[in-house]
């Protein structure tokens, strides 16, 4: 801003606008600071004859115009003197904090680095932490990225510097993080579009993208622009992401890029998010309606019914982000808009969203031509561009939405610790009846016959004794099963102590489930004690207040209408 001839008072006004944001409560201060740094503000000049000046703290368009500094052991005086291992500054603003531990020392772990940032530093030096939007923890062999509010289990490695690179691991992961997330042109992109604070968060959430989300959103944006109508074919492309890898957040990041990053191409677009189940519609809506500030769009909501959809979308001139189910589109819907700056993003694009062609349906009354929901959707928005997100890319998906633009496989997701690999491992808990026990059983039945019991009744009882439920519920088998489950679970937890391991035991009926529960509780009585954490002493009062008290193991069962 050298050409603006700012006065000393105006420079101080710009600095104070940041400094005077309260640091307590820390989450509110951090979010407000981030929004100010991200969006800038309009400053009224001291000379009222001059036009108000829009001030940006970071030049996101030209990263080279910014001043980047990395400072180690920076001393900060708060309630206590603290020295974070590393701070990353952009134009004097400490936007990232890094804490390092060594993998050699057994008494310190990467989890200790997380605790140091999220507990000690947030408690003792909040005036610094309100500026720290990114948080990095490392033990040399593992390096992970999150925010200062991110739970430890949601810190993840940035395993690729560039999308086509091989996945890094071990010591190289730190260098990959630096190159992939903290290069000048990368860190500015991450801060600008890939950090999300919900408008109204009751859980102090600050979402930082993972590397597959960062690459996927940008590649999908480029492909959508290339295939947009009227010059393109309207096939915005397919994103193949493993189940549980965060596709909904990828859709949110993509929506921001569409809404804000190329006005010449999109010209205030309308974005329609399409689900195929009500529960997914609700889940997606709950996220998107808290992202109005992030999307720079006040009209973000779920479409309630067909009437609401027609009133909202018919001849809408521009803008808006809407979440709806594809089943709301039918033959009667007809044309809603022929604009070309409508972007339809289909979730679970392999299921109900590929039926654009005619099918013959034979009934008792004759043969009829039917169409899928996707055909009616395209009748409603004939010039829209369509892109699909799926965990199961089938040929029809690619034919309708276009080529797979980017993918993140289950193996990659599992290797990165984002999803848990499901593997079948047969473990037999056999129940063997000894010869002596068999003789005792036969002796009992012989006695029953001698005393006048009906032979048919005896045979029926034998069949009942050998039925599956009886075998499964044999006390010895239940005991062996419980012991094997506990041993197996604890062994897996010991292999990867940094990951929260979960287990589900499926039983034939509720009675068997109850017996298994009691058998496991007999082996590990402490598992039935309700707690908020394995070690509550490591958490602050505020953190404990946000957690629900639960036992480590519990019984979950359904109940039918005829059950007592």
Residue ranges of each PLM-predicted region?
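ATP-dependent helicase/translocase motor core
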Residues: 1-270, 275, 279-295, 317-321, ...
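Conserved helicase motor
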Residues: 74, 278, 300-310, 325-331, ...
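Structural recognition of the conserved hydrophobic beta-strand(s) that form the central parallel beta-sheet
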Residues: 137-138, 322-324, 344-345, 385-390
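Interdomain helical connector at the RecA1-RecA2 junction of SF1/SF2 helicase-like NTPases
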Residues: 168, 398-500, 516-522, 529-532
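Conserved helicase ATPase motor motifs in RecA-like P-loop NTPase domains
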Residues: 242-243, 350, 370-397
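Conserved motor-coupling elements within RecA-like helicase/translocase cores
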Residues: 304-322, 335-339, 548, 560-564
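Conserved RecA-like ASCE ATPase "motif II neighborhood" in helicase/translocase motors
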Residues: 318-376
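Conserved helicase motor "Helicase C" RecA-like lobe of SF1/SF2 P-loop NTPases
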Residues: 510-557
